Amino acid sequence: MTLKAAIIGCGRMAGTIDDEITYDHADFIRPYGHAPGYAATEGVELVAASDIDADRLNSWCDRFNVEERFTDHGQLLEQVKPDVVSVTTPAHARANPLVDVVESGVRGIYTEKALCTSQLDLDRIVSAVRSREIPIVYGAMRRYWTGFETARAFLDAGHLGAPQAALIGAAGGSAFHTHSHIIDAAFYLLGDPEPLAVQATLTGCGEDELGIVHSEDDGVAVDTDPAIVHAHVELDNNLRLTCTDLPSLDIEIVCENGVLRGYGDSSRYAVMRRNARYDWEPLPFPDWQARSGTVAIMEDLLRAIHDGTPTRSGLDVIRRGMEILFAMVASHVQGGRRIELPMTERGVSVHSH
């Protein structure tokens, strides 16, 4: 049976991002946007879309051949009754549609990252999805790229001993919009450990200063999606993750007996094994055949719907990544203090993302 899909939010990630992918990359493969992804995935058909901007909605639906279109997502959910919904609104406008989608009784959800911009909204979304036990997948998609899958299999095979730490490049981009990708990839390569504590120093992106806003109810917000100067995340099983000045989206996994390095957002990998203190040798990294990460995500969601298998980027994976990002903000506001997770005070937010 072909499932009915709908998209809420007809912006860049809903489909037009594919226009930007005009370069060769070993793992960055179209289709990337949601509408082209549904068109390339068997067992699902995109039948409806919603956006509050009627002109944008109609232009987008004309381009992607979507007949049913709504400026009110509630009407879409009530009239179309989709099986699967993508929520691709901006992050600051994502929580309410997501909760509405959950409560409408859909069978599966594909949400973009970052999930939301406040801890209160994070708690609302997690509670709603958990109460309905709905399969969910997430737009931090590097864990679905074949290069990262190959790296995870290489590490799991024990060629370098047990992983001990991840170093990720945070020299460019912003924490919620950009580095949610590479933080999630690092967690995937480390085996998805639970975060225990965070320390961070942040700044504004580019020339902008990072403003801090305190509210009367003890909440705190930063006025833009911040850049990461430095961050350290303590993980269970004595693992750790450090955000460094490596080039943006580069990653190193430090193991007992060597290092695996990913360059250029999974463009290339290099492996060095340590035989003795001053005796290191390069190891070959396996070849891989790239595929669309978006299609892989959608296939994962369909398997969960039909077979009940957990998704690779499920609710706990999403929650962990968001808890880390909010804790970075809390740590920065408190002068880089160590913040234990999960945070008991839930008043952190990011104003403009």
Residue ranges: model-predicted function:
Residues 222-225, 232-296, 314, 328, ...:
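NAD(P)-dinucleotide binding in Rossmann-like oxidoreductases
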Residues 1-3, 7-8, 44, 84-86, ...:
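C-terminal helix-rich "cap/oligomerization" subdomain common to oxidoreductases
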Residues 83-84, 90-91, 95-143:
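Beta-strand-loop-alpha-helix segment that lines the small-molecule cofactor/substrate pocket
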Residues 162-248, 316, 348:
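Rossmann-like dinucleotide-binding domain that binds NAD(P)(H)
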Residues 66-73:
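Conserved SAM-binding strand-loop segment of SAM-dependent methyltransferases
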Residues 1-64:
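N-terminal Rossmann-like dinucleotide-binding module
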Residues 66, 81-82, 106, 195:
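Proline-aspartate-enriched helix->loop->beta-strand connector
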Residues 146-165:
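Rossmann-like NAD(P)H-binding beta-loop-alpha module
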